[in-house]
Amino acid sequence: MAANKDEFSVKQISPKLGGERGARNPYGPTSLHDLVEQMEFLYVDVIRAIKNSDVDPGPCDPVVEITLGNYKSSTKDLPVGPNMDWNQVFAFDKTKGDVLSVTLKDRLTNTVINKSNFKLASEIPTRAPPDARIAPQRYPLRNTKTGFYLMMSVWFGTQVDEVYPVAWFSDASEVSTCVINTRPKVYLAPRLCYVRVTIVSGHDLISTDRNRTPSVYVTATLGQVTLKTEVSSGTNPSWNKDLIFVASEPLEGTVYIRLIDRVDDQHEERIIGKLEKKLSEMTPLKVPSSAPALFYDIEVEPAGDSRRFASRLKMKLATDQAYHVAEESIQYSSDYRPFVKGLWPCLLGKLEIGILGATGLKGSDERKQGIDSYVVAKYGNKWARTRTVVNSVTPKWNEQYSWDDYEKCTVLTLGIYDNRQIFKEDQANDVPIGKVRISLNRVESDWIYACSYPILKLGSSGLKKMGELQLAVRFVYVAQGYARYSAPFRWLLPKAHYKSPLSVYQIEEMRAEAVKINCANLARTEPALRNEVVWDMLKPKTNTRYSTCDMRKVAALAFFDLFLYWPSLIVWLAIYLVVVPCIVLVGLSGLHKFLTRKFWNKRENPRSPLIVNDLKLWKLESPNLDELEEEFDSFPSSVSDVNILRMRYDRIRMVCQRPMILLGDAASQGERLYALLTFNGDDQLASFYCWLICVLVALCWYNIPMWLWSLYPIAYWLNFTPLRNDMPCGVSNFFRRLPTNEVLF
């Protein structure tokens, strides 16, 4: 089914944001919530139940119930402290009722002990930071003769309030003890570092069988990852093998090194030595360099083996702190900083984002009317998670977060997920709904982009719109002068990546390991950011449909060939009259646009959205369902139908044939150029022609003004009448006849 282009477009919205930027320190943390709509809550901070010393209430297990309109929250699922205290804040939408009812019950008998009502309009104060929190007090509940008072505080506040991240919201009152999984949180993932173990050589190695020459390979283990060298024979084997691991700060792990002797062809193996080195004992490389090669005595296996000399292993052990460990695909990278902080570039600016809400969300479970959704935003090593809005397809979050930005050529990633951790009986994995990515290169400084972004999900059944995510984005420059204007010209990656580059295979292998380490680190937080969420946020981009998309780009270049064969003289004159004045005025037009854009039109909102979804470019207007099914197929393939596999094999052969033909043609042209430069061939006339053409070109180059040379491509593109010829020119014929190596195949 053809996709509707307008359905997947980005729409500008006009939310009632919290106000203008105002005066504040751009170097400090963001405290104003001016990128979100203000949400007013009724906060109830329940501290404890206090016994009346004059009355003995007898055995009692107190429970507090708070009711506003149709919403009810209770402390029955909260642990009770030794002094009957809870210290829990409850939050209600103030528009859901006019009277707040607080009831103290006995859990054992389910009877009401005390009860009190508050009128929202007259009896509850309003408080906003930086005002201090309202002190709790003993509220005069009725029936205090039963022996209890209730210590609590009540006030009106917004999402700016410091209790917002820990409050128990009324829409999540049914999630009981799993309420912690619904709270907003900011996570700082530990920074990652490469650990390079270079196995140089072994010395005086002895096999367990003294009559046999050892065939040894070395394994190194850090955490759950084990790498090994090739097998090398002899008592003094040589490897010169780099084993690279990924470790997270504070670099407290241990590398376990084993020397394993392969006894026979049946791969019987025996450990002949071992060694342990802590990461803190390795050489920290903070500049592009190499660690010194040192000899290390190994512990001989089996234990108790006595010998007059020690076997040694020559190694280079270092923590490469000058590299940036990639955890994201390079196309979606949000950070390029190395591990060591001294090599970081200067702070460029502040990225601020307001997560307003979503509309029209669609979940994987069609039987469920609402969705328990939350948003995760990732930039650099800082992750932000909004609170979970329970059972709603149009959630409102209105939460604002900020990041320090060191490089503008980066991408902000936001994912929206269905929370499956809020009920004890439903402890499944969180389900991804979709993602939105925003390139900071498209964000102009000091503008507020308030847009509704389509949440797109590509599956085996085609492209689906899972709803829309409403965001407000702003970037503010902090750096000034030279630091700001030289930023586009500095190195994108740290210097070590250019001095001692890693291979593409190594980078991808380390990236997969970095994702696992981040999953493990963030899973240990409270509340945990689950593994499936981290993996989905860091998932690399898919490469399917690249062949068809890139061939469209090649076909676009062929469009210019149409200009060489204008259908009539009238069309040629019309194009000539339009193009030539544009070429003359292009410099003035560009300068005028730059000046008006930067200095005069600064008061206008930018027109271009941050994301442009080109369905034609990605072949998603009329997607091939079999290609999509192949893209989301497992590896190895789960398809058992031989005919489908044969069809896919033939299709990939055709796809691979196109670039091979292009590469063959390019190689042939290169061989002809090489033959021309080296004067290969038996025809001496070709050498003479080449010499003559070079002389003529040199004479023309030194005698014809440069502005005339610049007119030649324009004249060739416009295809003036004297230049029209359907037959190839003589120079092309001459070049075509030069020898190639095609005849050898």
Curated annotation (Swiss-Prot):
The chain crosses the membrane at residues 568-588, 688-708. Ca(2+) 1 binds at residues 56, 61, 106. Expressed in incipient leaf primordia. It is a multi-pass membrane protein. It comes from the Eukaryota. GO terms for cellular component: cytosol; plasma membrane. Gene3D superfamilies: C2 domain. Ca(2+) 2 binds at residues 56, 106, 110. Keywords: Calcium, Cell membrane, Cytoplasm, Membrane, Metal-binding, Repeat, Transmembrane, Transmembrane helix. Residues 1-30 are annotated as: Disordered. Residues 21-139, 171-293, 326-453 form the C2 domain. InterPro entries: C2_dom (IPR000008), C2_domain_sf (IPR035892), C2D_MCTP_PRT_plant (IPR047255), MCTP_C (IPR013583), QUIRKY-like (IPR047259). SMART domains: C2. It is found in: Cell membrane; Cytoplasm. One of its GO terms (molecular function) is metal ion binding. Its cofactor is Ca(2+). May function as a signaling molecule by regulating the trafficking of other regulators. Belongs to the MCTP family. This is Multiple C2 domain and transmembrane region protein 13. It comes from Arabidopsis thaliana (Mouse-ear cress). The lineage of its organism: Eukaryota, Viridiplantae, Streptophyta, Embryophyta, Tracheophyta.
